[in-house]
A protein has these predicted regions:
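Hydrophobic/aromatic-lined pockets within catalytic cores
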Residues: 110-113, 117, 121, 125, ...
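Helix-loop junctions and short alpha-helical segments
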Residues: 69-196
């Protein structure tokens, strides 16, 4: 009995340490910090690519004026071919780069919310945690075979599986987990709408190579794309997306802090926008809907013009 008592005491001390560590990390907002760093890295990457692309195109235009070999066509050189591809990317606002950024940003958002929940679970009252788990199938043997930290991850996984949150639209994916955990942040309607549409676009590139389906067009009424056509993410849409993500993550963290007795002021918009009201106009779709995908020969604006010119020339012969 003394041995059992020592084991139970050791486990009790271990639980206290885990709760204390979780509370410290939650107070410090470490998952939020990591997410903000991801957003800033994405902003930097998109900015560097755009600026470098425009500068490289400027250099290429100067080289066009002074060819290295007299009589050589600039378009036939390696630099000329590269600059032509670069020009298409710039004119079309780097569509595939923005699409990949969108998928990555949503994945980082999911990871941030999961990490916040994992820190929140040990801080909950046991009665609240029991209520949250009501209705889930708990395999006691599987649960007890795990270490303390793994048990929290297992609990979160069970909650996510039982609710099918990943199939929900917009931030419903996260609210389906947060609400049972007693976390209900106040979310501005503009932020909610932005994340609803951004997730719909993200799903297209995660599962359909960017091609619109009926579900997307229902979630984004008025979008110029038709079923089967490519949905082009604009730079403004990406900015609106990660801005709304930042505001949402800060709201979730603030709600957790309030429940723990350390309330925080409502999150303010990041410095690159004036107010949340700026988000919805930034979601305006690109009116141009290409015939092909960003990686196809027929994607560029100028390809349609070139085909028209060739058709006109052929008809005049």
């Amino acid at each position: 009995s003394n041995g059992l008592s020592r084991v139970l005491q050791a486990r009790s001390r271990e639980k206290i340490l885990i709760v204390t560590d979780a509370r410290k990390e939650l107070d410090a907002g470490l998952p939020v910090r990591d997410f903000l760093l991801y957003v800033m890295s994405t902003r930097t990457l998109l900015g560097v690519v755009s600026e470098s692309g425009n500068f490289s195109l400027h250099v290429a235009s100067q080289m066009r004026l002074t060819p290295a070999t007299p009589g050589e066509r600039f378009e036939e050189t390696s630099i000329g071919s590269l600059s032509e591809n670069l020009r298409r990317e710039i004119e079309n606002d780097f569509p595939l780069l923005h699409a990949n950024a969108l998928v990555g940003l949503w994945g980082a958002l999911e990871a941030c919310i999961n990490d916040l929940c994992l820190l929140w679970l040990p801080c909950m009252e046991r009665q609240e945690l029991g209520d949250a788990l009501e209705g889930t199938r708990v395999k006691l043997g599987e649960y007890l075979s795990l270490g303390e930290e793994e048990q929290w991850l297992w609990i979160l996984d069970q909650l996510q599986r039982s609710d099918g949150g990943s199939l929900r639209t917009g931030i419903g994916q996260f609210e389906s987990i947060l609400k049972p955990l007693g976390v209900s942040p106040s979310v501005d309607s503009a932020v909610r709408t932005t994340l609803f549409r951004i997730k719909a676009m993200r799903n297209l590139y995660a599962h359909r190579a960017g091609r619109a389906d009926a579900k997307f067009l229902k979630e984004w009424p008025g979008h110029p794309a038709s079923v089967g056509q490519i949905v082009i993410p604009t730079s403004n849409q990406i900015i609106a997306g990660y801005t709304a993500m930042v505001l949402y993550v800060e709201a979730v963290h603030g709600s957790m802090q309030s429940k723990l007795g350390t309330p925080r002021s409502l999150p303010e918009p990041p410095p690159w926008i004036n107010s949340v009201e700026d988000l919805l106009p930034m979601l305006e779709p690109n009116p141009y809907v290409p015939e092909g995908a960003p990686w196809s020969y027929h994607f560029s604006h100028d390809q349609q013009d070139r085909d028209s010119s060739e058709d006109s020339a052929a008809s005049s012969v």
